[in-house]
């Protein structure tokens, strides 16, 4: 990586102290190195908001000849896995159609997200029957495979992928994102080599990772696996991916897809000016995600500092006429190596189409960034507290 890219990583990727000037300079330098960046994306007001929003909607992931274009705001379907309320199949599919009709046409799921893959199969068939070919061409279904700790034989890997293909009713998976629990078991390389072979047979279009750390990503790439992206937890509070991981990604062209970007809903007006230290005084932490990300807040700096962050984000949101979640997502999309950010969808229960689409036209200026960083710099460096990307899932 050249000196410009390294200075960008140091100026904006670590949880050190930043200045608006260094941020703006880094953005200008990095834009010239990244095809996806919109001119003056994060450093000056947009002269044509509509054009900027259109150009900023989609991102091309690639490794060699493998390519996949996705919407930069992805619909996360983990909330179909239980714990967020009962999902009605018909209502869920109608909601998916609404998201796709409004340009939010990339869906992220997994083999273990309850009926997510089955819902996608019903949805994609309705798109084929009821929507114009132009919309079908933009729809993407990204799934994950989280195998048990067994020997990764060719037949086992192939049969597992065939299950997802049948459930999603596609000849080839747009993207298979691979997860592995235990790094001491090198079977992950065997699995990825089999997945690469299946890609060559036309059963998978692109291979990606989820929750892998920087060292394992390096090993995987050195073994010739054509990884296009790594899905990791990344938010204004959790900036770990902007340390070692982003540097390797900039060197190799691998992109980041982020989840936890609105922290399960904690980064929203709902939790502004609340006191969770008093039982029943504030909104209930009544989903697995809210409980998980509240623990992340505690590790980062506590509820009082988090309230200061929410107040700052609210000021920025009011300035631009958007919501706190919209600001939170835009901030992460502007980070080096980030191709897209996930927002969880409670299909048939609630929707965030307006807020999600507002992300594309939002331009955070130097003052906005400076005000946000003044707060986040007070928090702990979670790389030191938790470890690298995905380490939270592998701690003893």
What are these regions (language model features)?
Residues 2-139:
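N-terminal binding-site loop/beta-alpha segment at the start of enzyme catalytic domains
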Residues 57-60, 181-383, 391-396:
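Beta/alpha (TIM)-barrel catalytic core signal, keyed to glycine-rich beta->alpha loops juxtaposed to Asp/Glu
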Residues 78-90, 145-156, 180-186:
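Active-site mouth loops of central-metabolism enzymes
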Residues 86-100, 152-169, 190, 213-219:
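Short, acidic/polar
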Residues 101-104, 170-173, 204, 227, ...:
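A structural motif
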Residues 106-111, 173-177, 208-209, 326-328:
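Short beta-strand segments at enzyme active-site cores
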Residues 135-149, 176-178:
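A short, structured active-site edge motif that brings together acidic residues
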Residues 165-187:
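Active-site groove signature of glycoside hydrolases
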């Amino acid at each position: 990586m050249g000196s410009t890219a390294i200075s960008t990583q140091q100026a904006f990727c670590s949880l050190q102290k930043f200045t608006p000037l260094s941020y703006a300079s880094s953005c200008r330098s990095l834009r010239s190195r990244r095809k996806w960046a919109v001119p003056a994306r994060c450093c000056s007001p947009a002269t044509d908001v509509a054009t900027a929003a259109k150009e900023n909607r989609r991102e091309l992931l690639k490794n060699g000849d493998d390519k996949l274009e996705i919407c930069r705001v992805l619909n996360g379907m983990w909330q179909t896995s239980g714990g967020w309320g009962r999902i009605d199949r018909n209502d869920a599919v109608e909601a998916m159609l609404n998201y796709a009709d409004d340009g939010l046409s990339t869906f992220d799921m997994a083999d273990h997200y309850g009926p997510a893959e089955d819902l996608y199969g019903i949805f994609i068939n309705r798109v084929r029957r009821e929507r114009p070919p132009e919309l079908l061409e933009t729809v993407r279904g990204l799934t994950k495979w989280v195998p048990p700790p067994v020997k990764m034989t060719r037949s086992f890997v192939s049969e597992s992928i065939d299950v997802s293909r049948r459930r999603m009713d596609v000849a080839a998976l747009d993207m298979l994102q691979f997860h592995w629990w235990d790094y001491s078991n090198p079977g992950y390389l065997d699995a990825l080599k089999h997945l690469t072979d299946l890609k060559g047979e036309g059963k998978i279009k692109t291979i990606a990772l989820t929750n892998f750390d920087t060292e394992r990503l390096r090993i995987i790439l050195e073994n010739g696996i054509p990884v296009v992206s790594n899905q990791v937890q990344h938010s204004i509070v959790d900036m770990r991916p902007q340390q070692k991981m982003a540097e390797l990604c900039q060197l190799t062209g691998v992109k980041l897809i982020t989840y936890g970007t609105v922290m399960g809903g904690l980064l929203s007006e709902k939790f502004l000016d609340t006191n969770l230290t008093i039982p029943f005084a504030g909104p209930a932490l009544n989903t697995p995600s809210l409980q998980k990300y509240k623990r992340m807040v505690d590790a980062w700096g506590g509820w009082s500092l988090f309230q200061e962050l929410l107040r700052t984000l609210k000021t920025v949101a009011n300035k631009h006429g958007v919501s706190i979640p919209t600001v939170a997502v835009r901030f992460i999309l502007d980070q080096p190596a980030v191709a897209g950010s996930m927002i969880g969808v409670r299909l048939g229960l609630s929707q965030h189409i307006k807020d999600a689409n507002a992300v594309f036209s939002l331009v955070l200026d130097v003052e906005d960034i400076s005000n946000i960083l003044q707060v986040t710099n007070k928090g702990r460096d979670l790389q030191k507290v938790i470890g690298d990307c995905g380490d939270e899932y592998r701690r003893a």
